[in-house]
């Protein structure tokens, strides 16, 4: 039961971090990683309770996707910093329609 509480707490911290922090892209990326970690812990808890391997398999897939997502996100942020000189969210007005 403690895994469920831990997962919910980490999920809430990640969501609140995304909502409350609108100034730094790196902190927002870290909060997205917290949400993915919480979902992984929840799947592992489900796998342990139901005695199945599906939760563990999905957890490995989620961790793989999270690693790729963070690598791509950091590469985009490095290029954005080289272009703009800042990683502040407020300075991002590159998308014009």
UniProtKB/Swiss-Prot annotation:
Key word Coiled coil present: no
EC number: 7.1.1.2
InterPro entries, sorted: NADH_UbQ_OxRdtase_chain4L/K, NUOK/Mnh_C1-like
Name of the protein: NADH-ubiquinone oxidoreductase chain 4L
Any one GO molecular function term: NADH dehydrogenase (ubiquinone) activity
Sequence similarity: Belongs to the complex I subunit 4L family.
Reported function: Core subunit of the mitochondrial membrane respiratory chain NADH dehydrogenase (Complex I) that is believed to belong to the minimal assembly required for catalysis. Complex I functions in the transfer of electrons from NADH to the respiratory chain. The immediate electron acceptor for the enzyme is believed to be ubiquinone.
Keyword Acetylation: no
